[in-house]
Amino acid sequence: MNGYISPLPDAAWNSRFPRSLVLLGSTGSIGTSALRVVERQPELFRITALAGARNVRLLARQAAAYRPPHLAVINGNAADELASLLPAGYRPRIHTGQEGYEFLAALPEADCVLSAQVGAAGLRATVAAARAGKTIALANKESLVLAGGLIRRLCHETGASVLPVDSEHNAIFQALQGHDAAQMRRIILTASGGPFRGRDRTFLQSVTREQALNHPNWSMGAKISIDSATLMNKGLEVIEACHLYNAPLEKVEVVVHPQSIIHSLVEYNDGSQIAHMGTPDMRIAIAYCLGWPRVMHTGVEPLDLLSVGSLTFESPDISLFPCLELARKAYAGGNGLPVVLNAANEVAVDLFLQGAIAFLDIPRLIEAAMQAHDAAPHQNMYDEVESILTLDKTTRRVTADLAGARG
């Protein structure tokens, strides 16, 4: 696909089975779904490494089931606990910290690296995989939000490939197959609208953590569930689309589609639109990437159009859910603003989950952090990992200070 962020995997990789997998974030929602995909067709895959952040017991159970030679945990203090939970006679090499994740991402024997860490924490490992020329099944959208230009450059230097796991971008990727991207008129990202679609400001002022986590269609982790409720998830996906498909911002649109059956669409210059439809289950997109170009059995029930009945669409309410527009402004503004947007959002979401701020404070904090960044002098292009993560760290501190001042 011309203009795509990376070369596609070559013929040798396409035919390589069983395929050696490194799963970064194996204990999260995407990681556990990926292992369910592997379970159905174990002859096609070999688990080489598993990495988890906090759920050491689940990581130990996964490791006992697949016996990979490498494991990783973020917290070095958890390594001994993990080792103690493993079956007798099984002694994998246990890596720790971000360095451990980066080591796994670049393992010479790895055919495919699933980047499924949550948030900016996934950047270093994604970049390490790109530097090593790996095929990356990318679920960590923040890597592109923070460093899309850097990852594009690395992929074209090393031959690394990116296959998008996000359901929307996986849909677009599929809709572009066999077509010239130059003939694409626009990308249409669909959004469920989240749990608060149709609610008014009065209701949003007092929503609880539990209400915000209750997504109507998808089973997801806490952070992405809140991002869906604020529409920030869709804002991040707009930025992701621009990087993945080299699309101008004005060619990426968002439409609310409450049923989450159409996962996204591509419109071509002849007026036609190609949509990807399916049951809202992440195993479909995960299997598409892990098994590329083979279409695999996933265990997902096929879509029954008669049961679905009707599909509806509406415009997003930007006045109630300004995060979508903040993301557009961040991408258009450049100069590190996408990094600020993401870092401020991660801090604000965490504060909301702790009960420290209200739901409507999330976009207010993000906007305040972006304004503070705009007001400061800058001498950095934020196009390398260290400068990006320095800005990320600074923004987290500024956002926490802003939240304290508001409190």
Curated annotation (Swiss-Prot):
Pathway listed: Isoprenoid biosynthesis; isopentenyl diphosphate biosynthesis via DXP pathway; isopentenyl diphosphate from 1-deoxy-D-xylulose 5-phosphate: step 1/6
Amino-acid positions noted as binding 1-deoxy-D-xylulose 5-phosphate in the UniProt annotation, renumbered to this chain: K141, S167, E168, S192, H215, S228, N233, K234, E237
Residues the record lists as binding NADPH: T27, G28, S29, I30, A53, R54, N55, N140, E142, G221
Annotated catalysed reactions: 2-C-methyl-D-erythritol 4-phosphate + NADP(+) = 1-deoxy-D-xylulose 5-phosphate + NADPH + H(+)
One of the record's GO molecular function terms: 1-deoxy-D-xylulose-5-phosphate reductoisomerase activity
Originating species: Oleidesulfovibrio alaskensis (strain ATCC BAA-1058 / DSM 17464 / G20) (Desulfovibrio alaskensis)
Coiled coil location: none
InterPro entries reported for this sequence: DXP_reductoisomerase (IPR003821), DXP_reductoisomerase_C (IPR013644), DXP_reductoisomerase_N (IPR013512), DXPR_C (IPR026877), DXPR_C_sf (IPR036169), NAD(P)-bd_dom_sf (IPR036291)
EC number: 1.1.1.267
Protein name as it appears in the record: 1-deoxy-D-xylulose 5-phosphate reductoisomerase
Keyword NADP attached: yes
Broad EC category: oxidoreductase
Keywords: Isoprene biosynthesis, Manganese, Metal-binding, NADP, Oxidoreductase
Gene Ontology terms describing biological process: isopentenyl diphosphate biosynthetic process, methylerythritol 4-phosphate pathway involved in terpenoid biosynthetic process
Binding locations of Mn(2+): D166, E168, E237
Entry function: Catalyzes the NADPH-dependent rearrangement and reduction of 1-deoxy-D-xylulose-5-phosphate (DXP) to 2-C-methyl-D-erythritol 4-phosphate (MEP).
Gene: dxr
Needed co-factor(s): Mg(2+); Mn(2+)
Source species, domain of life: Bacteria
Any one Pfam family match given in the protein's UniProt record, by short name: DXP_redisom_C
SUPFAM superfamilies noted in UniProt: 1-deoxy-D-xylulose-5-phosphate reductoisomerase, C-terminal domain (SSF69055), Glyceraldehyde-3-phosphate dehydrogenase-like, C-terminal domain (SSF55347), NAD(P)-binding Rossmann-fold domains (SSF51735)
Family affiliation: Belongs to the DXR family.
